[in-house]
Each structure stands twice: as C-alpha cells, then as structure tokens.
Amino acid sequence: MLTLDTLNVMLAVSEEGLIEEMIIALLASPQLAVFFEKFPRLKAAITDDVPRWREALRSRLKDARVPPELTEEVMCYQQSQLLSTPQFIVQLPQILDLLHRLNSPWAEQARQLVDANSTITSALHTLFLQRWRLSLIVQATTLNQQLLEEEREQLLSEVQERMTLSGQLEPILADNNTAAGRLWDMSAGQLKRGDYQLIVKYGEFLNEQPELKRLAEQLGRSREAKSIPRNDAQMEAFRTMVCEPATVPEQVDGLQQSDDILRLLPPELATLGITELEYEFYRRLVEKQLLTYRLHGESWREKVIERPVVHKDYDEQPRGPFIVCVDTSGSMGGFNEQCAKAFCLALMRIALAENRRCYIMLFSTEIVRYELSGPQGIEQAIRFLSQQFRGGTDLASCFRAIMERLQSREWFDADAVVISDFIAQRLPDDVTSKVKELQRVHQHRFHAVAMSAHGKPGIMRIFDHIWRFDTGMRSRLLRRWRR
C-alpha cells in the first residue's frame, strides 16, 4: 500500500510547512502562554522539546498509510499520464467510472469538464490531467492535516499532563534552569496526581525544617575527588575502520527530487513528450523537483588517530555525584523517617540544579536501590518516599554496597553519605580498613548525617564529616522556639 510520505514526494507536497504551522499554533495556545508566564524556568525546557515533537510528527507522516481509494486513484492518474491523446479518449469512460466508484472529489468536475466539450483535444487532455493533479494535491494536503490534527490533540494532552506535574514540583525540585530542564525530562512518565503528591508533602515538610535544608546545602558544597585529564600523557596510535560514501553508485536506494536527467522516472520523461506539459517539465528541471532514482554506495577505509596512553589524574574538585545510604531500622521510624526522606529530597534538588547524580540505597536486612536523578527519577523518588522504616540495622552491608559502587568508573568521584542514628554494632575490621584505604588512596569522602545524639563514637570516627541533626524532643522544641 502507498505511504503518505511517497504520495507527498510524488505530488511535491511539502509536509514541513504543515508541521511548522502546527507547532507554532501549539506553542501559541492559551494553556502554554499562561504556563510560561507562571513558570518561566520551564519555558526553555519545553522549547527544547520542539525538535523531538518535529521528529515525531515527521515519523508519523512517513509511516502513515494512504487510504486504498486514494491509492487506486493515484495509480490511475499515473497511468493516464503515459497515454497519448487518442489512447486517453479510449480510456476516458473507464477513468470516469473509476472516479465515480471511488467517490473522488474530482469525479463530478471531471464529468462536467468532459460533457462541456464535444470533442477531446490535446489541450483538453492536458487540462484534465492538470486539474486532476490539483485535486490529488488537495486530498493529500487534507490527509496530512487530519493526521497532524490528531497528533496535535494527543501532543497537547501529553504536554498539559506534564505541565501539571512540573508545575506542582517546580517549587520543590527546580532551583535553576538546569533543574527545570531535568525536571521536565523526568515528567515524561505515566504519573497520576495522587502519586506525586507524596513529593509535595515531603517538600512542605522540608520547608518547615530550614535547619535540615541548610544542612543539605552545606553538604552539597563540600569537595570530593574528581578525575581530570593529564597534560603530559604519552600518545599512542589507535586504528579503526570508518564507512564513507563511495564515488561510484552501487544500487538503487529509493526516490528523490533532483535535476539528474540520466536517472529520471518514466512518468517524468513522458511529460516531456506532451507539448502542453513541456514548460512544466523544464520548470521542475530548473527547480530540481523531477522524480529520479537515488543511487547509493559505500566504502570502508582504515583511519588512524592518536590518543593518550594514560587518560586521567585525580585531584580534588567540587560537585561529584551522591551515593546516599539510609538506615531503615525501627529506631529510624516516625520523625526520624520524615527527616531522612526530606533530606534525600533536598539532595535530589541539589543534584538536579548542579547536573549531578543522586543514588539512594536503603539498608536494613537487605539493600534497596533508587536513582533519583535518572530519566525515571520522579517515579523512583515516589517509590523511595513510600517505603516504611521497620527493618534492622546492618551498617556493614551498607558500607560494602557503597564501596562496590565506588569501584565503578562512573561513580569514582562520588560523595558517600550515610543517614542513620548510628545506634548499631561496631563495624568489622575489614570494612574499616577498606574505607580508610579509599579515603587515603582515592580521596573519597564519607559523610555521616547523625539523626541522634546517642550514636556510637566508635562507628562515627570513620567518617570525614559528621553533620548532626538531633531529632530528640528537646532539640525539636528549641529549633521551633528559635524560629
């Protein structure tokens, strides 16, 4: 069956103009205008999505199938172009019957044109084909517009859902334009209002605890190890095979519009033999709009480039990713649980604003992992906030999981953060020695966020920094009184 993309090429219908008109109309819609005014940071993020919309619309038009009736009419039109005037006169009754059977918009006008002339001349033959072509162009344009209108409604519905989600979470998670852009990318998932209200709830709780929020910001500004390129690295030759277009064509690859006379399609060449269409042929030749075969060839060659033998040194630089371990034991329930979750939400906000990664691990009797800065970050955050803290405490497993993560290249410069009340058994000697080795050799930094004033000093001595946030009743009352 004929595709809409092929039909557009055959009739020289430009779908690009239709796509641009639809996108401009979408961006100018009242819903987006009000949203842009209310959330200016998200305007750039939505605008950056326009190329993706454009590509999706092109793909939709390219893959769309032309209705069988229109396909049959187009085939009949192409065959009629090849007929001489005497042959056309013989075939005309069958052509009119076919147009009537297909309910073509051109059927009634075609019959009126024939009935109004007693004899069929070559000029009438040319006029018939020209008007028929115009009718087909109108039908193709209408089909393009119908498909684009369907896509516009679907796209507008998707954008409105994402705007609702992003608008709710922007005050909580978007601290700058970078965070707003990443938040918009995350909003592409299938989420309902009740899902993300959990993030809103903990965002409001974080605003009620400014000391906790300030603690997260201080931790976010700390320094950690980061890889940097070496200046004195030796170079080595690296060989790879690259594919390049060949100068000699090898096979037919498709159709294209050009002025290549040697590769013309037969229907195009036939119009040159019709006197009335000769000027039309030359016009399309000058404008490079003639349908021709597209030929293609490939050749492979070896390419040699030089690259450094040793790529990286390591030095202290700010702003690496976060690896956060959260204690989910029973002693961390209640207010401690709220503070731990809100603190992770604050780290997620910092990670989005500074284009960092934020990886959460919950430890009790088993390890559960969430990445809050990935494409599914909002869904992962909702799952994390839905967890309840009712397990035991296995701090050793937590450290082993952190050290395993730090071995990978993408997390080599990460900050490790452990959130706990640190009421637990002492760490095994092998874990302690491995942590000290990472601190000494690779300059990794381990941070403790202590939720209790009764944490064991023997455990906490292993950390580079200890950030204290006492959740006892006395400390909570003092903080409230100071505010």
Swiss-Prot record:
Gene3D superfamilies: von Willebrand factor, type A domain. One of its GO terms (cellular component) is cytosol. It comes from the Bacteria. Its main location: cytoplasm. It is found in: Cytoplasm. Keywords: Chaperone, Cytoplasm. InterPro entries: Uncharacterised_CoxE (IPR008912), Uncharacterised_ViaA (IPR023481), VWF_A (IPR002035), vWFA_dom_sf (IPR036465). Pfam families: VWA_CoxE (PF05762). Component of the RavA-ViaA chaperone complex, which may act on the membrane to optimize the function of some of the respiratory chains. ViaA stimulates the ATPase activity of RavA. PANTHER family: PROTEIN VIAA. Belongs to the ViaA family. This is Regulatory protein ViaA. It comes from Escherichia coli (strain 55989 / EAEC). The gene is viaA.
